[in-house]
Amino acid sequence: MNASPPVHPQTETPGLPGVSFGTSADGMPVALVGDTAFAMAKARDGRRYLVTAWRLSKPMGEWTRDDFYGHSGERADEAAFRARVLENAEHQHEKRALSRHEICSRASTPWGASQGATVYAEGVTSHSTAGHGGFKLSAERNRKVHPMLRSAGGWYEEDAAWAIVAITFPHLFTAFERRCAERTVKDSWPDAWEAIFGTILQPGESHEKDRRSFEREHADHWVVASAITSKHEPGFVEVVATLGGKRGAGTEERRFLVPSGEYSIG
């Protein structure tokens, strides 16, 4: 008598068509949003990570860890995994409702020749190149950007400056994109954020503002600039420290041995 194959139930999420959750062949929590597959994979150290794949042809119950290649950060538990999947589903649903459309483009950009572009609205275009990309705003659109954040040429690269476009024209972006943009502008341009929105960012709300505070408070302290496990003194970490953590030619350095058990990164 043949044993019955394992059952891997798949559930559709009410209110969000096209979102399904299930279990992979090797026991991972998995999900499908449109053509994007998600899984919560366990690493050797026991931590769990969100991994992704695109257009898997197999049924969800036949997926395995080897099918996934994208890495999207650590997740604490299955609840956090499901929350991230639903956030992505909301993002994709909202994006379909926007009037973005793809066009062929060979425009010259600061990052090389455009290999394609997405038009968000008249005068707001995102270009992709071989190595980078970003937004180009028309002169009229660019005048709407706050002077503290405005790029003279109307180009805004995709790593951080894209967020300037998003907070200037929020109606062209999804809720997820707007949240990411808010975080990016606070972290990178806190002075502009405070001026535009009439608020004061508190400790922990801006990487850049926190960095400045740290440098002021520790300007006269020896701050670790680099560290390696010592090859000469087992059980110790060799650290290089500079005043205020400054770097560059001519900066005075001091070297210390710190017991490995007492050294922590942070």
Set out the residue ranges of the language-model regions.
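Surface-exposed beta-loop interaction hotspot
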Residues: R75-G116, F197-D220
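Ubiquitin-like/PB1-type beta-grasp interaction modules and other compact soluble beta-rich domains
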Residues: A195-H232, V240, F256-V258, Y263
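Short, charged/polar micro-motifs that form catalytic or ligand-binding hotspots
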Residues: S151-D159
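N-terminal accessory interaction module
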Residues: P6-E90, A225-G266
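A short, structured beta-strand/loop element
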Residues: H127-R150, G244-R255
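Short, compact, well-ordered microdomains
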Residues: D66-A80, D159-P203, F256-G266
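Charged, low-complexity intrinsically disordered regulatory segments in eukaryotic signaling
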Residues: R106-L137
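A solvent-exposed interaction/effector surface
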Residues: A117-T118, T125-T129, R143-A152, C180-P203
